[in-house]
A protein has these predicted regions:
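Serine-hydrolase catalytic-loop signature spanning alpha/beta hydrolases and amidase-signature enzymes
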Residues: 27-37, 48
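Flexible "cap/lid" loop of the alpha/beta hydrolase fold
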Residues: 94-102, 107-138
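Active-site loop signature of alpha/beta-hydrolase-fold enzymes
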Residues: 30-31, 54-57, 118
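Conserved alpha/beta-hydrolase catalytic His-Asp/Glu region
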Residues: 130-166
């Protein structure tokens, strides 16, 4: 399913449906296809919002959970969302947790799916290997409950990002 990405100032996001606001924060490998089933289900009863976290736009110093939480906080203030059902997946769950601990006045409920920060599967006994496609594929697969979620297109995208950001 393809969704229109809206822009309001510096913020890019998807917004579908009407009703109570459900904001979904994506993970590190945040392909919108990961949320398409949830968007399709809830857009009939909720305003579903998926802000595009600036994972590769922020400078390295601010590409942190704290930096992403600040970005998210400014986003919901800018859009004036209140009584939000906040759902975070993976890194997005970690950002949601930090946000709830700092600024809970706009959040009605919190839903976590595979949130980082609860249990971390480290990189293992090796250093990250740029240029090694097979290594990147395996690490990308480890990110998901179902390794088949790491499609060739997603692995290609991660491989490109890892090798460009030096």
């Amino acid at each position: 399913m393809t969704y229109q990405v809206k822009q309001d100032g510096k913020y890019k996001f998807i917004e579908e449906g009407e009703g109570e606001t459900l904001i979904m924060l994506h993970g590190l490998f945040g392909a919108m296809s990961n949320f398409s089933g949830v968007i399709e289900h809830f857009k009939h009863t909720h305003k579903v919002v998926v802000p595009l976290l600036p994972l590769f736009e922020l400078d390295l110093l601010h590409t942190t959970v704290g930096g992403l939480e600040k970005f998210f906080h400014k986003f919901i203030d800018h859009r004036n969302y209140t009584n939000v059902h906040l759902m975070g997946n993976s890194l997005g769950g970690h950002v949601a947790l930090v946000h709830l601990l700092k600024k809970h006045d706009r959040i009605k409920t919190l839903i976590l799916t595979g949130s980082s920060g609860l249990f971390e599967n480290g990189m293992g006994d090796s250093y990250p290997k740029r240029g090694d496609y097979e290594y990147i594929r395996k690490k990308t697969e480890m990110t998901f409950y179902d390794p088949n979620t790491a499609t060739k297109e997603l692995v290609d995208e991660v491989y490109q990002i890892v090798n460009e950001r030096m």
